[in-house]
C-alpha cells in the first residue's frame, strides 16, 4: 500500500458531546444502548494492568505493591489478593515506585522503581501466580538502574534501563536473574552518544517472536532481533530522528523537542501477527512568546500511529488515530495524549488519560474505525486499556485509572462492543472560541535550531488541574505518584504562595508546604558573586519576567544546561524544573522544582514518595537535601545545608557552573 501522511490539527474545542471521530479514524454505527462501564473496583495507586491468558484475572501494578482482581463476573469484580510494601524486611526496603507488571505464563514480574529512588531497592520481583489468590514471591533480581517498564516472554525479562548514559534495553533470565544481553541505540549508531540521554530514553518495549520493539522517545522506535540476546541485530527503525540535529539543539530547543511532536515515542505494541505496529506518542503543548508580544501554544497531545512492519527494514505508516482534544493541552493542563494500548484480532483498545478509553476496528489499518469512546474526565485518568475475554456474544476489556482529584484509582471493566456514551462529558474548563493550539510557521534561526516564535517559552499558570504520572515520576497532586506537574499553583492557596520563604546559605529553612508530596518546591541556591548585571526576576506563580543582563542570562543558561543532563527518566516525559531567578551579580539562582514525572523536575533531584516521605538530593551541585519527614506530617520541607546551599560555577565539571 502507498504510505499515507497525516497532518495533525488541534483546535480549541474540547471533547465533543457527540461521538464524532477525531482526525484519523471514523465512527461506526452505534450498538443499541449506551456504552458504559460494566463495573469498577478501587485500587490505591493503580498503574499498569495485565490480563491472564484465560482473561479472568487482572494483575495491577499499584505503586506501593500489586493487586490481583477476579473479573470473571465483570459487573462484580473481586479483589483476590493485594500485596503492599514488598521487601519491607530489607534494610533498604520496601520495594516501591511500582508502575509496571507483566505476565509470562503463571509468572508475574513486578518492576521498579519507575523513577530513581535513592537508597531503595531496584529490580524485578518474580511472583508465582499459578494460584492468583495466593501469589508467592519467589525471587528478587536486583538491578543498578530503575525500571520504568518491562516485557516478559519465554523465560526472559526485557527491562528499560535508563542509566543516564547509554540507556540500554537489558535482557535477564527470569529464573536465575543472569543478564543475557543488552542493546542500546548507541550500539547501532555511535552518533547517538552525542545526544543527551534524556532525548533517547528507553521508555518501553514490546517483544514479538523475540523481536524487541523499543520505544526511545525522540530517537524513535527500533526493531531489534534478540533471538540471541548476546548478539542483538537491528532490523529497522520507525522515525528514528537525526542524531546530529538533535545533538545540536540548545537547552531550550531540547526542552521543546522533548515535550512536543514529532518524536516522543512512548509505548509500542504489535497485533497478533506482529505485522502491524502501534506507536503511542505522548506529547503536550508549550506556550511560546512571539516577537510581537503575543503568546501561542505550539504542539499538543498526540495519538497512536499504525505502521506496517511486515518488512522491518522499510516500515510504512498506514494511519494515525488522533487524540481527543483538550481544553488545556499543556503539561500542567488536561492530558488527553495517548498512553498504553492493546491489539486483539482486528481491534485496538486505547487509553488517553483524562480523554478516556476508545475501541477501534483496525482491520483496515489505513482507515481505522472508532467503535466506542467513554470518558469521565473529572474522575478517571486512564493508564492502559487491555482486552480481557469473550463472554456471551460480546466480550470484555479492562482499563486502569489513576484517578483524578479525590476520585480513587481504579480498575474498570467495559463491554467489548460498539456504542455511544450517554450524555458524554466535555473537558472544557472555560467556554472559548479561540484556538488553543497553533503551529506557527518556523523561521529558522541562524543556528537552525529554534524558531522566531520560540524566543521564550513559559508555562501557563491559570489551571490547577493535576497532571498524571509517569511515567517519569513521583506524581502530580491528586493523580498519584506519577505526576508531571510544573505549575506551582497546583494545590496551594494564595496565602501559601505569598508566604513561602526561600532557603538561603547557612541554617536550614522551611521552604514549602508539602501536605501533598507532589507540590512544587522552590529552593534558592547561593553561588559566589559573578559579574555585575541586572537580576532576572520571574514571579514564581507565572507572571512575566523582566529582561536579564547578558551575564545573568549566561548563568541561567549554564544552570539549565546542567539540569538538562540530569535525570533522563524525568526529562523523557517532558518534565521541567524552571530557573526562576539567576542573578550573576549576587550569584543567586532560584530553581522551581516542577513536578515532572518524578515530581521534581529535570535537575539532579531524585525523589522517593510512598505516601510518606520525599527525599530530593542536590549532592552534585550543593550538598543540600530537601526532606519531608517520614512521620506522615507533611506540612513542610526542610533544607539541610552541606555547603550551605552554595552553587559553584566554573568549568570544574558536572554540577559546577
Curated annotation (Swiss-Prot):
One of its GO terms (molecular function) is iron-sulfur cluster binding. GO terms for cellular component: cell surface; extracellular region; plasma membrane. Residues 446-469 have a biased composition (Low complexity). Pfam families: LVIVD, NifU. SUPFAM superfamilies: Fe-S cluster assembly (FSCA) domain-like, YVTN repeat-like/Quinoprotein amine dehydrogenase. The chain crosses the membrane at residues 466-486. Residues 568-625 are annotated as: NifU-like. This is Probable cell surface fusion protein HVO_0405. It comes from Haloferax volcanii (strain ATCC 29605 / DSM 3757 / JCM 8879 / NBRC 14742 / NCIMB 2012 / VKM B-1768 / DS2).
Amino acid at each position: 500500500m502507498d504510505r499515507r501522511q497525516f497532518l495533525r490539527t488541534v483546535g480549541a474545542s474540547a471533547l465533543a458531546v457527540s461521538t464524532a471521530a477525531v482526525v484519523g479514524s471514523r465512527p461506526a454505527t452505534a450498538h443499541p444502548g449506551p456504552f458504559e462501564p460494566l463495573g469498577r473496583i478501587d485500587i490505591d495507586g493503580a498503574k499498569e494492568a495485565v490480563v491472564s491468558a484465560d482473561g479472568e484475572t487482572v494483575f495491577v501494578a499499584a505503586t506501593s505493591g500489586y493487586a490481583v482482581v477476579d473479573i470473571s463476573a465483570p459487573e462484580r469484580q473481586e479483589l483476590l489478593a493485594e500485596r503492599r510494601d514488598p521487601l519491607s524486611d530489607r534494610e533498604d526496603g520496601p520495594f516501591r515506585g511500582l508502575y509496571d507488571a507483566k505476565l509470562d505464563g503463571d509468572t508475574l514480574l513486578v518492576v521498579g522503581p519507575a523513577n530513581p529512588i535513592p537508597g531503595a531497592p531496584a529490580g524485578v520481583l518474580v511472583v508465582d501466580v499459578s494460584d492468583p489468590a495466593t501469589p508467592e514471591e519467589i525471587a528478587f533480581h536486583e538491578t543498578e538502574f530503575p525500571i520504568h517498564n518491562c516485557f516478559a516472554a519465554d523465560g526472559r525479562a526485557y527491562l528499560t534501563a535508563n542509566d543516564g548514559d547509554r540507556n540500554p534495553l537489558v535482557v535477564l533470565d527470569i529464573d536465575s536473574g543472569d543478564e543475557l544481553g543488552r542493546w542500546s541505540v548507541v550500539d547501532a549508531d555511535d552518533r547517538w552518544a552525542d545526544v543527551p540521554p534524556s532525548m533517547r530514553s528507553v521508555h518501553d518495549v514490546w517483544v514479538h517472536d523475540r523481536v524487541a520493539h523499543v520505544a526511545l522517545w525522540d530517537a524513535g522506535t527500533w526493531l531489534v532481533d534478540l533471538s540471541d540476546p548476546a548478539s542483538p541485530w537491528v532490523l529497522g527503525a520507525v522515525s528514528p530522528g537525526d542524531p546530529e540535529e538533535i545533538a545540536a539543539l540548545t537547552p531550550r530547543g531540547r526542552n521543546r523537542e522533548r515535550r512536543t511532536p514529532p518524536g516522543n515515542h512512548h509505548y509500542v505494541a504489535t497485533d497478533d501477527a506482529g505485522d502491524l505496529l502501534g506507536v503511542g506518542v505522548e506529547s503536550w503543548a508549550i506556550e511560546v512568546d512571539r516577537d510581537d508580544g503575543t503568546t501561542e501554544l505550539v504542539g499538543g497531545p498526540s495519538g497512536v500511529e499504525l505502521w506496517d512492519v511486515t518488512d522491518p527494514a522499510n516500515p510504512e505508516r498506514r494511519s494515525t488515530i488522533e487524540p481527543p482534544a483538550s481544553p488545556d493541552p499543556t503539561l500542567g493542563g488536561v492530558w488527553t495524549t495517548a498512553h498504553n494500548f492493546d491489539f486483539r484480532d482486528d481491534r485496538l483498545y486505547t487509553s488517553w488519560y483524562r480523554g478516556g478509553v476508545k475501541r477501534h476496528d483496525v482491520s483496515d489499518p489505513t482507515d481505522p474505525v472508532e467503535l466506542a469512546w467513554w470518558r469521565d474526565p473529572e474522575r478517571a485518568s486512564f493508564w492502559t486499556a487491555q482486552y480481557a475475554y469473550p463472554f456471551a456474544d460480546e466480550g470484555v476489556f479492562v482499563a486502569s485509572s489513576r484517578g483524578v482529584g479525590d476520585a480513587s484509582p481504579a480498575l474498570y471493566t467495559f463491554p467489548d462492543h460498539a456504542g455511544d456514551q450517554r450524555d458524554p462529558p466535555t473537558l472544557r474548563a472555560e467556554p472559548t472560541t479561540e484556538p488553543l493550539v497553533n503551529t506557527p510557521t518556523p523561521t529558522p534561526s541562524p543556528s537552525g535550531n529554534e524558531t522566531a516564535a520560540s524566543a521564550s517559552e513559559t508555562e501557563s499558570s491559570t489551571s490547577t488541574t493535576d497532571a498524571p504520572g509517569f511515567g517519569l515520576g513521583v506524581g502530580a497532586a491528586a493523580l498519584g505518584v506519577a505526576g508531571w506537574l510544573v505549575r506551582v499553583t497546583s494545590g496551594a492557596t494564595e496565602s501559601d504562595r505569598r508566604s513561602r520563604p526561600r532557603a538561603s546559605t547557612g541554617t536550614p529553612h522551611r521552604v514549602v508546604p508539602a501536605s501533598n508530596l507532589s507540590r512544587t518546591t522552590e529552593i534558592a541556591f547561593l553561588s559566589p558573586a559573578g559579574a555585575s548585571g541586572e537580576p532576572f526576576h520571574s514571579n514564581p506563580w507565572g507572571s512575566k519576567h523582566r529582561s536579564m543582563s547578558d551575564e545573568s542570562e549566561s548563568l541561567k543558561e549554564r544552570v539549565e544546561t546542567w539540569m538538562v543532563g540530569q535525570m533522563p527518566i524525568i526529562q523523557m516525559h517532558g518534565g521541567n524544573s524552571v530557573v526562576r531567578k539567576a542573578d550573576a551579580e549576587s550569584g543567586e539562582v532560584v530553581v522551581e522544582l516542577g513536578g515532572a514525572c518524578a515530581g521534581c523536575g529535570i535537575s539532579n533531584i531524585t525523589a522517593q514518595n510512598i505516601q510518606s516521605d520525599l527525599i530530593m538530593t542536590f549532592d552534585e551541585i550543593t550538598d543540600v537535601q530537601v526532606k519531608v519527614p517520614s512521620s506522615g506530617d507533611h506540612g513542610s520541607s526542610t533544607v539541610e545545608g552541606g555547603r550551605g546551599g552554595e552553587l559553584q560555577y566554573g568549568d570544574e565539571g558536572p554540577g559546577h557552573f
